Structure formats: C-alpha cells, structure tokens
C-alpha cells in the first residue's frame, strides 16, 4: 500500500463550516458547557519483545505477523509493574504536566479488565500511590474527596468511564469547575503458545476531562450496540481438590515415585484432620477451589465477527441519533465517514481497523455513486439469510468475510484507510494490545503523527469507535480544538517508545510464568509494587512505593 509522501492538509470549506455549526447545535443550547479531552498521558512498560524474536521462538512466519497484522513489538510488564502502577504512573504524568492540584480533581474513574481484586477497586491502589507522592505538598487528605471506582466491560470499560465523566463534567459552572481523570490500565496477557499470544501488550493511561478542552470536544451523541455473547471472557474456573491431588500424584509417578493404589481417596478422607487443612488451597474446607486466570477464553474468528457487527450497528444507531438531533441530514450531507478527517478505533492488533471497517465503509455509502462503482466491480454482497441452521450461517459468514476482504483491496478503500485510519495503528504496532487503552493509544498515535507531518487539524471532526467483548460497541465523534498542538507537542510518544529495553525469549517466558525473581530493569522515577502480604487478615494486600530516579 502506498502512503502519502507529502503532508495531507484538510481543506476547510463552506461545507466543513456547515458541519461545525451542526456540531455545536448537537451539543444543546447556547448555555450548554462544551466538554471533552483536555490532555492524555500514557505509561507503558520499559520492556518489550521484538516480534522477530517472538516469531523465532514460536516458529511463526514473521512476515505474516508484521505485514499481515502490523505487529513489530509487544510491551511486557516487569516484576514490579501491574495494573495499579501503570495507571498511577500515567496519572502522575498528567497531574505534573498540567500543574493540577489534587484537591481540585473531583473523580478518577478507572476502566480495566485486569483488576487486582474482586472487591477492592484497583483505583484505590492508584489513589494510595498518588497520596504518597503528593501528600507532602498538598496534605495527607489531598484525594479524600475524590470519587473513584473501577468500570469493567472488557476493552470498552475506559470509554464507558469517559462518557460517564463527560456527563458529570458537563454540569460544571463558573463557580464549580468539575475536573475529572479517566484512567485506563491493562495487561493483555494470553496463554503461552495460544492463538492470541502474539497480540499481547500492556500499558496505562490517564485522560483529563474538563470543559473547554484544548484537545478534543465530545458532543452528547453516542451510538450504542449491545449483544450478550461469549466471544472473549475470563470466567471463574472451579477445580476439585480431588483432581488437584490426583494430578500431583500422577506427576510424582511420572517423576519416578512409587504411588500406592487408592492413595488419593485416603488423602481426601484424611484431609479434615490433616496438619495442612488450614493451609493454601485447603484452608477453606471446600470441595472445589475457585481459580482466576488473567488469560481469557476466546474465539478469535467469532470475536472478529462480533466486533464487525457491533460497530456497524452502533454506527447505524449513532447516525439515527444524529439525524434526530439535527446534526445530520442523510439526504443533503456528505456521508459521516467522509466528514470525519480521522477515524479512531479499538485496535487489539494494529491492522484490526483496516480489516474490520469495510462493513461501515459500505453501510455509509450504499446509496452513493462511489459505492455503485465499487459494487459494479465486486458484485453484490452475499444475500442475507433467515436460517437458524448453523451450517448455512457459517457459509454466509465466510462469504461475508470474503466480501469484506474484497472491499479492503479496492482503490477507494485503500485511499480511505491511508488518509483516515493508518496513523492510529503506528503506536499499536510497537506496543500491542492495551485492552481498554487501545482506542486512546490510537488517538495519541494519530495526533502525534499529524503533528510531526505538520498537518492542520484545527476544527476537524474525528470519528471514534470503541468495542468491548461480551459484547458492546460505541460510536461517537469529536471536534479538534485549535489548541491541540500545544497539548500534543508535550507527549513525545514515539520518542519514548524508541527508548525501551528489549528482552530475550527466556526472560519473556520467566516473566509470563512468574518465575522472574527480581525486576529485569530496576524501577526508578516510578511507582513500584514492593510486597504482597501472604497470610493473616491482610493476605493478598498489595503494597506500593515511589522509587526516586
């Protein structure tokens, strides 16, 4: 694919101003408060694994991973890093860069699917670290009146947290400006040698939400699609104590130990009187042990189809709401995806948007001359069916997959992708999946790429498409502030990515399995996990500390 070699400068026409006027009207009356994203900070691990090394480790085709999926590297958390530290480090960057007084931050809502506790919000661990950092200057109670909570809906949790916080910030007044921070933080970890292993990544971020934002104004028009499915989930697994003991005995036998017949049953009967009955997995006296794993149960192909369907349906819902609000007139206005100078999407891997967006591209243009030209070359889309026969459904789905691929190879779509979507995938190629943060990483990647290429984005419209397995999609839009350069110029995203430390496959697998005894790179100038209490009434409590540079 050939990309533009010269800077692309959007032309501000009379039509553009018409959209801008409608955009303002969609916000409500003239007394409404304009709210949105004022700044974004991101923190990612200093460790990464080069995709060439990963391909060698797993015997994969690097060309397929790189050229086919857009993968170059994956971020890997060190021993002292977790969801809380990555989130806290990002919030600290945001506070320091913007000179915020913690006492003026009214809420910090965390979107994550990598929570560290089943009851205690991970956001409270983040507040604990931030209090350590800022208490000397602002007092031990500097975050006492800050509302915090975790929000979970797979990869769309941080988008949900942002929309919730936007509603709250919109109630700001001149006497009471509401300042909120939305946090995203996740470790996208998959089982070793699984089909999703090469899409791993990690990182945290913080989004400053307030009125009159310097980066992106977001109106209150949100398209939503929710369908309960099992495309990707992290269930609580249950394992019987008997099966655990039986597996240990089998392992001992395979290691050369002589095991007496019936020993497992005798051990189970003896357990209530045993000296180990109050230790470890036996402590609760239950027949089954609940096990949580960070690695998901997933069906990649099915999840892709859920993603395509949900985003298409959410886009349709967004367009309906925009028409009702007066923001959009389908008969007269240019199509939405043409109005949007950039399209920001959730990227579980870098080229996901390139592969998934053809549905919306077609749906938004079906009654246009341009689509008539495309359809003349491709032929009509496969006819929808009403069958409940799984064989017929699968045949139709495969036919639709082929039609989407055909759309993605047309000159019209290639140009569309290059000008509107491609810049968002550049940082994703270097980090991997960030779950809740992937859409915001794409946003940062787009802005910084346009800044480096001296593109004028002032007052341009962005379309944003979030997705979370389970499944839900949201489609909304934003208007770029003329002040965006002063914000983006302080990010240095790609410069920081270039300064990371590569690890070999032994270190990678040791970190993944929890066998790495100490930090690969000692923490400095960051928050770090220093202890997890192992017993007593504080069992499982996590302790963190700021480590000076």
Residue spans for each PLM region:
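Short, positively charged and aromatic/hydrophobic N-terminal segments
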Residues: 11, 18-23
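Condensing-enzyme catalytic core mediating Claisen C-C bond formation in acyl metabolism
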Residues: 23-80, 197-316, 322-325, 372-373, ...
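Conserved beta-ketoacyl condensing-enzyme motif
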Residues: 37, 83-159, 328-359, 393
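Acidic, glycine-rich active-site loops and adjacent beta-strand->loop/helix elements
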Residues: 43, 111-117, 152-158, 183-189, ...
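Short, well-ordered amphipathic alpha-helical segments that serve as non-catalytic structural scaffolds
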Residues: 61, 84-98, 307-329, 442-446, ...
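Conserved catalytic cysteine-centered active-site region
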Residues: 62-85, 115-181, 364-438
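Flexible, glycine-rich active-site loops centered on histidine and acidic residues
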Residues: 175-207, 212-213
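C-terminal catalytic subdomain
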Residues: 392-403, 418-490, 494
């Amino acid at each position: 694919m050939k990309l533009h070699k010269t800077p692309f400068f959007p032309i501000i026409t009379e039509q553009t101003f018409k959209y801008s006027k409608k955009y303002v009207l969609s916000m409500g009356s003239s007394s409404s408060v304009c709210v949105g994203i004022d700044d974004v900070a991101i923190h990612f691990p200093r460790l990464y694994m080069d995709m060439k090394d990963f391909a060698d480790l797993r015997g994969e085709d690097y060309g397929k991973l790189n050229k086919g999926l857009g993968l170059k590297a994956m971020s890997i958390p060190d021993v002292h890093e977790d969801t809380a530290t990555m989130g806290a480090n990002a919030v600290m960057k945001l506070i320091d860069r913007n000179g915020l007084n913690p006492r003026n931050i009214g809420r910090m809502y965390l979107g994550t699917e990598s929570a560290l506790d089943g009851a205690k919000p991970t956001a409270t661990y983040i507040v604990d670290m931030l209090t350590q950092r800022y208490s000397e200057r602002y007092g031990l109670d500097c975050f006492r009146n800050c509302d915090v909570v975790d929000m979970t809906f797979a990869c769309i949790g941080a988008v949900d947290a942002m929309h919730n916080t936007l509603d709250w910030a919109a109630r700001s007044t001149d006497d009471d400006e509401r300042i909120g921070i939305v946090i995203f933080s996740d470790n996208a970890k998959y089982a070793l040698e699984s089909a999703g292993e090469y899409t791993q990544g990690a990182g945290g971020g913080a989004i400053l939400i307030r009125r009159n934002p310097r980066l992106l104004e977001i109106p209150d028009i949100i398209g939503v699609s929710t369908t309960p499915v099992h495309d990707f989930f992290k269930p609580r697994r249950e394992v019987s104590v008997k099966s655990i003991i039986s597996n240990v005995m089998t392992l001992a036998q395979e290691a050369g130990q002589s095991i007496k017949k019936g020993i497992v049953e005798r051990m189970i009967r003896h357990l209530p009187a045993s000296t180990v009955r109050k230790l470890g997995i036996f402590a609760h006296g239950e027949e089954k042990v609940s096990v949580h794993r960070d690695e998901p149960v997933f069906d990649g192909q099915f999840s892709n189809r859920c993603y395509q369907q949900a985003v298409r349906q959410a886009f349709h819902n967004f367009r309906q709401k925009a028409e009702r609000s007066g923001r959009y007139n389908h008969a007269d206005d240019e199509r939405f995806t043409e109005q949007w100078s950039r399209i920001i999407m959730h990227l579980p891997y870098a080229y996901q948007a390139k592969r998934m967006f053809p549905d919306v591209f077609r749906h938004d243009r079906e009654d246009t001359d341009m689509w008539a030209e495309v359809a003349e070359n491709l032929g009509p889309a496969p006819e929808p069916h009403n069958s409940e026969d799984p064989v017929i459904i699968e045949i139709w789905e495969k036919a639709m997959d082929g039609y989407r691929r055909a759309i993605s190879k047309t000159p019209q779509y290639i140009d569309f992708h290059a000008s509107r979507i491609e810049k968002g995938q550049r940082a994703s190629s270097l980090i991997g999946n960030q779950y809740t943060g992937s859409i915001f990483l794409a946003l940062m990647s787009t802005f910084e790429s346009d800044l480096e290429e001296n593109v004028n984005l002032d007052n341009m419209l962005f379309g944003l498409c979030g997705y979370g397995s389970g499944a839900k999609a949201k489609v909304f839009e934003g208007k770029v502030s003329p002040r965006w350069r002063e914000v983006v110029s302080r990010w240095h995203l790609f410069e920081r990515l270039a300064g990371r430390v590569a690890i070999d496959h032994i270190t990678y697998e040791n970190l993944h399995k929890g066998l790495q005894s100490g930090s690969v790179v000692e923490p400095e100038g960051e928050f770090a996990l220093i202890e997890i209490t192992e017993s007593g009434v504080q069992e499982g409590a996590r302790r963190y500390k700021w480590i000076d540079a």
